[in-house]
Amino acid sequence: MEQTWRWYGPNDPVSLADVRQAGATGVVTALHHIPNGEVWSVEEILKRKAIVEDAGLVWSVVESVPIHEDIKTHTGNYEQWIANYQQTLRNLAQCGIRTVCYNFMPVLDWTRTDLEYVLPDGSKALRFDQIEFAAFEMHILKRPGAEADYTEEEIAQAAVRFATMSDEDKARLTRNIIAGLPGAEEGYTLDQFRKHLELYKDIDKAKLRENFAVFLKAIIPVAEEVGVRMAVHPDDPPRPILGLPRIVSTIEDMQWMVDTVNSMANGFTMCTGSYGVRADNDLVDMIKQFGPRIYFTHLRSTMREDNPKTFHEAAHLNGDVDMYEVVKAIVEEEHRRKAEGKEDLIPMRPDHGHQMLDDLKKKTNPGYSAIGRLKGLAEVRGVELAIQRAFFSR
């Protein structure tokens, strides 16, 4: 695997020198300063590429080129936003950057309720608490019909939880959910959030798939033409939330994408932490079935709790993800490609490390502190080395 590291640009508290010292050779980044929907110019792409290369690294993957909400709702200026996206892909290819991670999650990108969940060893992790999320949705957001998405027990627990929250607790929970986590390109006030949800009131799973198909049929031929590999990121968490449909959550969703636009430019990001939240997702089977189309991997693990919809970020080699079998399947896919004369490694980045050690004293991007990811990268690197030596050494 190509060892990469997500970097949020010049304002990231983790420097490119840190990235290189961590042992990564590739950088995963994006032009976050460009508004959603606008074209990434060749000039801006080359500026960022030069910064990365001057540090002795390579810009391996774009994460992400965000998709404008008009495209997802098939309203407004969506045709222009699609044309802009096509041009951005052409410009990236012209600059030699050919792997693009993206997602089709409506309104919200990845979502957590607690950004400082304290683990038994004193380190901090990200957590999604189903009951706190229900309390937010029913008692703070007050979304009409929200009760239909929860069990009677969850509704009762959410009411109790909300009653014990201080004003500060409510503000923090609201901020965690709607203000935008690292990599998310949209942040909202509560009123803005309600208005954006309203835009989806008539969009169910079938309709969102229809809108996604319009996007894929416009974008994938351009990607194929210029040699760019599109790698869709799964929903996080991988299930409907806030009354919004989610359409990249299961192996059936992956098959739908391939059936909709059967091009090798139409591929996947294997995010083990996102897919792995669902107990019914067999990650190794997903890799084996869609291996030739996996162009990027996020390796992390989550741990489901007593309520199976509640989870926290586990250490990379612990939790519900069998990281050994996952890495073995990825390495096997790389060797399959090599046998076909393809030498390209699959970029991998350690995802969502714990905040630990000296980073506990620093202001960090939630999930993206240096030391936790350094630990995760070292652990995954060790797993891969053992697999390569045991099964593929000559």
From Swiss-Prot:
It is an enzyme of class 4 (lyase). Pathway: Carbohydrate metabolism; pentose and glucuronate interconversion. Its EC number is 4.2.1.8. It catalyses: D-mannonate = 2-dehydro-3-deoxy-D-gluconate + H2O. GO terms for molecular function: ferrous iron binding; manganese ion binding; mannonate dehydratase activity. It comes from the Bacteria. GO terms for biological process: D-glucuronate catabolic process. Pfam families: UxuA (PF03786). Its cofactor is Fe(2+); Mn(2+). Keywords: Iron, Lyase, Manganese. HAMAP family: UxuA (MF_00106). Catalyzes the dehydration of D-mannonate. Belongs to the mannonate dehydratase family. This is Mannonate dehydratase. It comes from Escherichia coli (strain 55989 / EAEC). The gene is uxuA.
